[in-house]
């Protein structure tokens, strides 16, 4: 999450066409998650990111996991991905998210979205 926080602290503007001049990552939601996960620049798209992940249960979400509408069928345009930060409430209905949106990089509280958003964990991460 430390890498994700760096973009929140120095908010990057949003762009699907341009890359960050320092890191080389695309300045959209999937480029941001790719950067946080240390995938190769310029980063994967929301269509490709699920190939790097395993689907997990909502109750198993840990900081740095993804909440995503991605994979085949999203064509990249309708897809979106955000990083899970922490639960806001005991009922697990809202969470802190780190994400790249049209106004730039933000950390904000979001209600846990329903389908088509699903929780994912990067394959190289293990709980514990």
Model features per residue range: what roles?
Residues 41-106:
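...with weaker cross-activation on analogous glycine-rich loops/strands in unrelated enzymes
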Residues 104, 110-113:
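Catalytic cores and adjacent binding grooves of peptidoglycan-active enzymes
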Residues 19, 37, 54, 61, ...:
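Short capping/connector residues at structural and topological boundaries
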Residues 6, 36, 86, 95, ...:
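Residues in intrinsically disordered, low-complexity segments of regulatory proteins
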Residues 113-128:
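Low-complexity, Gly/Ser/Thr/Pro-rich intrinsically disordered linker/tail segments
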Residues 1, 5-7, 96-99, 109-110:
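Extracytoplasmic low-complexity repetitive segments enriched in small/polar residues
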Residues 1-37:
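N-terminal capping segments
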